Amino acid sequence: MKKFLTVVLAAVVISAGQLSAQRGQLLAGAAKSDVTPSAETLPKTSYGILDHCYARAIVFGNGATKAAFVSFDAAMMNQRLVDAVNERAEKELGIPSGNIMYNWTHTHSGATVPYDQLVELTYKAVKEAAESMVPAKVGYGNGVSYLNVKRDLFDPERGTWWEGPDYDGKSDKTVAVIYFESLDGKPIGTYFNYAMHAVISGNLDMVSGDFPGAASRYVESRYGDDFVAIFAAGAAGDQNPIYFQQTFDLRDIRIADYAKRGEDISNKMPPGGVGMDRNNPEVARLMGEQKQMVESYGQLLGEEVKYVIMMMRRFVTDVTISCHHKTLSVPGRRQLNGGGRAGYQGEYEDIGPVTIDMHLTMLDDIPVVGTSGEPYNPIAVRLKKESPYARTMLTMLCQGTFTGYIPDDESYVAQSFEVLGSKFKQGYAESAMVNAALDMIHDAVHANAE
């Protein structure tokens, strides 16, 4: 009972939001900016640019208020960037501060221009999207893709927990798609959500949007130069690409190479491709396959997005728009020991409360919930099951403050790097997040009903 009370109080007491109860004709526009750094500005450790990274924006309104989805082909959030763009968007475009849902695709190979330039390019995308708004309609659909898999695995050969494809593990295959189109049938943009880590190109040490960037480009190529396809990472804290053998093989090669030099990295993870012999023909072959896999994953996911759009039959033109926020405070912990990447018993001490930021953008009957951390997949599945709206989705790495991995309660038994390093005590965060999301949806619905 004590845990339950802590969660409920945390979710209810600290909240803020922007609500609009009015229904009106949907307006929508979209734009994007190339935020790839120039080759000459890349660090010496970089091997160049594999593909370009973008800031993408879809702005929508209903005559009473405006809101937006903004995504970045990058790994982590930036609160300064969010604050700077929000300030200008509210002052110059009339988008209320807090009505923009930002998400980072979490590509582990992303790179962007310097901060000041990134602010300008991001705002440029938002501004151009706002200026291109036209009367529109919106549709929603769900598809499926079997590209993801639970990545926390008890390895019988190692006799311990490790990272690998758990084919029997919990893994939501849903591809959730929001699609905007003008009243005369011109495609405007799409926001699609799928739970899978963007880690295919991580060993290459090249700038890349990984599979999210490839999927977005693939979908955009179908609908024209002005079309914008935003990838939103679902609850992928424990989800990897199912076909990931190139990375596993490269790890084994790197472990063996380090061992020859007298260093044991069998339970460590050097960043990127550090320490790999790129003159080794096998390394070169595997890295070449990784480059192909980026495009393959993007194409296959993009095909499902296109199919879902093609099969949409019902659209709405008059919509309500509600945005709401909560900051949760839940019991935290600090790890006291370290035994490598995985496969050992963690030791912890209690610390003060730690926070999780939650956001809701509710477009008519489509609740898009965002969180600042990397939640495990079962948290999103539970939210969708308990939500009164079938079109509910959960996007991770939203807004500007990163809060780390958030395992579901059941998964704390795993001695995986995500669970070991999590700063959230078992038994609190999962319910706090689900209840906060349901509270925000309730508040949005009641605001629209008044």
Stretches found by the model and what they are:
Residues M1-F4:
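Positively charged n-region of N-terminal signal peptides that target proteins for export
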Residues Q22-E450:
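Conserved beta-alpha junction segments in alpha/beta enzyme cores
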Residues T6-A16:
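Bacterial N-terminal signal peptides
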Residues G17-A21:
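Sec/Tat signal peptide C-region and signal peptidase I cleavage site
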